[in-house]
Each structure stands twice: as structure tokens, then as C-alpha cells.
Regions:
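Beta-rich interaction modules in large eukaryotic scaffold/regulatory proteins
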Residues: 98, 105-152, 156-206, 212-229
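Extended, compositionally simple hydrophobic/Ser/Thr-rich segments
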Residues: 82, 104-105
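C-terminal helical accessory/scaffold domains
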Residues: 1-81, 86-87, 91-92, 96-97, ...
Length: 229
């Protein structure tokens, strides 16, 4: 079954009735089962396992591996173009710093530079700012401001985009708080504030981590350290 799941994500094709029959089961059930596993892991507050489970959910949905370029999720970009970017080993985050002409030069296709630049800036991305305040010796209040930093396109993003907000301990092993944040198209240019209450322990740790991860897009993640020093 693991091999079939890997083949499904890799978009491999099989010959033979038995394998094709098993692949139908994987196609129909894998995403649903993985979502259930993710919810179970999250209920136990296991941060690293939850991160891996959510990533695998998205790999199944997108039929691509996490190691691939996030640009593969834009179906209008030719695969050959994405492969060129992947072969460059150019970090996706650094593509934001390039203009259309520079992107065209990078892939040696000047005419496609503007289109690729547009897709890069349509990739779901949120900027984060936090304000913390102790409430009691064991409770901390966090006001998290989320600001969308991408260009909305109805054909790509629909009417809303979902994100998971995690507050993790200093070792990123325990989820101290989690909630689902739904960004609607109507408010895609506005700042949004989420108020959270999380436990604190003695001795006081140096910091917590806030991670905001897209529910559907591989590679869409923002991490904000919250220092207590």
C-alpha cells in the first residue's frame, strides 16, 4: 500500500487489472484517511508529527512531493519551466526578490519572466506580527496580526483560503495551541487579529514559535519566534 501511495503521488501509471483496482482504492481513500490521521495527531498535540501529517495530506491532494518547487501547484506553468527552476536549486523564497526580467534570465526564457513573476506573487503568503502579555503566572495572551501578502485570483484561490495557526514550545515538539483561520476574498487586503491564550511554564523558556501553515498549499508557511527575553 505504501508503494501504491508513493506511485500515486509521483503520478506513475500501472498496467494490469489488479494494480489498477488497488490504485482506485488509494485514489478514493488516501486523502480522507490521511486527514483523519492528521486530526488524531493534532488532538495529541504532537507538533512534528502534525506537521508531517499535514504535509502528506497536501502531497496526496496535489500529487507532488514536498521537495518539489511550490510553483508546480500552478497548473498553467509548463512543467519544463518548473523543472528548470528546480535544477537551479534556487530557493523559492529568493524568487520574491527577483523582477520579471531577472526571472526570465534565470530560466533562460525572457518571454515567460513576467508570467512566472505573477504566479510567484499569487502564492499564498502571510506576514505575522505578535504582541504578548502575561495574564497570570501560567497563562500568556498573544495577539497575532496576520497580513495577506499575495495577489488574489478567483480562479486560483476561490472565495477563501484556509490556514492553520500553531503555537509550539521552544523545541517544536508540543502544540500549545492551534486553530483554523479562514481568509475570505472580501478581506484579502486587510489585517486580521487573532487573540490566543497559551500556557507558560517555569522555568520560563527562551521563546515559543508561531507557525501559520496553509491547509492546501505545499510550501506556504510562515514561522514567527516569540521571545520571552
Amino acid at each position: 500500500m505504501i508503494s501504491l501511495l508513493q506511485a500515486y503521488i509521483s503520478q506513475l501509471k500501472f498496467d494490469g487489472f489488479a494494480l489498477m483496482s488497488d490504485m482506485v482504492y488509494v485514489t478514493q481513500s488516501a486523502a480522507r484517511l490521511m486527514r483523519a490521521i492528521y486530526e488524531m495527531v493534532l488532538a495529541h498535540n504532537w507538533a512534528q508529527l502534525a506537521d508531517k501529517a499535514l504535509a502528506l495530506c497536501k502531497m496526496i491532494d496535489r500529487r507532488m512531493w514536498q521537495s518539489m518547487s511550490p510553483l508546480r501547484q500552478f497548473k498553467k506553468i509548463p512543467v519544463e519551466v518548473v523543472k528548470k527552476i528546480e535544477k537551479k536549486n534556487f530557493p523559492f523564497s529568493r524568487l520574491y526578490d527577483l523582477g520579471p526580467n531577472e526571472i526570465g534570465e534565470l530560466i533562460r526564457m525572457p518571454k515567460l519572466g513576467r508570467a512566472i513573476h505573477k504566479y510567484i506573487h499569487q502564492f499564498p503568503k502571510l506576514d505575522l506580527i505578535s504582541h504578548i502579555q502575561p495574564i497570570t503566572r501560567s497563562t500568556l495572551s498573544i495577539d497575532l496580526t496576520l497580513t495577506p501578502d499575495f495577489q488574489w485570483d478567483d480562479k486560483i484561490h476561490g472565495h477563501s483560503q484556509g490556514f492553520w495557526i500553531f503555537v509550539e514550545d521552544v523545541d517544536s515538539e508540543i502544540v500549545l495551541h492551534h486553530e483554523f483561520f479562514l481568509l475570505k476574498k472580501t478581506f484579502c487586503e486587510d489585517e486580521h487579529t487573532v487573540k490566543m491564550f497559551v500556557p507558560i511554564f517555569e522555568p520560563l523558556p527562551p521563546q515559543y514559535f508561531i507557525r501559520v501553515v496553509s491547509d492546501r498549499w505545499l510550501g506556504s508557511e510562515t514561522v514567527l519566534p516569540v521571545s520571552f527575553r
